[in-house]
Amino acid sequence: MRKLIFLLPAAAVLTCCGLKELGEIVPEPGIPDYVDPPLPKTELVVTGLEYPEGYDWNRPETATGAPDIVMYRGDKLVLRIPTGDGYSVSEDLDMHRYIGGHVYTDYSSDTHTIVSRDGLELFRYQGRERIVLLAEHDGHVLTLGESRDGRGFSSRVDGVPVFIGFDGSVFQNAGVSPGGELRFFYRLPVNSTSGVIYLYYAVVGADCVMIELPSDIVEAYGFAFPETPSSSAAEETDAVGGIKVLCRRSVKDVQDATQMEIFDVDAGEGKPVRASGFFSSVRAGTVLSDAAPLLAVFSVSSLFSSRTAVYSGARCWQEWSRSDIPTGFRHLGDSVAGIRKSLYGSGVDILCNGYVRDTLPKGYTTMTGAALCCTSRGIKVGMTSTSGGRAILWNEGKVDSLMFRGIVTSVTEEPVVLEGE
């Protein structure tokens, strides 16, 4: 139907359909008067370490000066934090993280652990800890730290202790419950007549429950809380209900040597999973996500070959041709994506559903799994130059030069917040 701007047809519209603005199109019967809403506008937030001109981060022992932690929104620099002992900010890659619009840092002095936000100290506490989890909830900062002497850990809210373990170590998959409490697993080594064995515990808030496993489980590689657990562990069933374990049972013959299980603690039974082909041993394993679907990874090897197996939600059983477990695994819709250093020289492989989807430019590498960003809009990877040049961003095949010279530490895609919202 053509849009007519003449007076006479417009008058007809006024007569037949009621009062309409002149020139407005009236939908024909049977044609919906709506269109699909556009996707919300997003922007990329990139954090990194920016080094002074001439600094060689491949040979830091010969370099002078110190990097700054930088944060960019698109092409705009919005934050710069100097590092060094005088600022109580470390240049180590794992001692800063981007959360909710802010950069949080942790630092260990000779006597204290110091937590800062955007370069300003929030709190400090006695003892030297490495922060393995930092999260925000209702205006509070939650931390889980491991002692730098290798024994003991503590969970805290705004620096105040909630749970302290004087021995043992945090064992993967720390997170925050829907009720806003820190939840994590830890293991405690115990001497026995057969050697050292491990006892495993689940902690939610200030409550701790031992996880009882069958005696024929010879090794537990990782644990996952249920997707929507109770926010309280006051009852044992609330603390352990739905917890799953990636584990290996004792084997009767060599063909079962690589069979793994996803063991349901509450049900007391496991679901066998195994890599196809003949492999004689399991080299390593981990549970990388406790979100639905559960994502577990392990590597297997034989005399002649090795590979990495990925288990995702009981329906995605993928395998890669190398045994080194890649970094930065993410769910990508119904798929599983990851990154690893390329087998052939420099460059980075993007893995998706068991195959190498793309090999990113030679002369660049990734330094942390947080440099991988997966959203409904696709895959983005922040990459660091191995020759000392500018960092780049790989965005679904398109490569853009970033605004700083240094190491990319995280890439996050967020909705654009307009002024006044």
What is each model feature region?
Residues 19-421:
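Residue-level hotspots at or immediately adjacent to binding/recognition sites across diverse folds
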Residues 15-16:
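C-terminal motif of bacterial Sec signal peptides marking the signal peptidase cleavage site
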Residues 1-4:
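Positively charged n-region of N-terminal signal peptides that target proteins for export
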Residues 6-9:
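Sec-dependent N-terminal signal peptides
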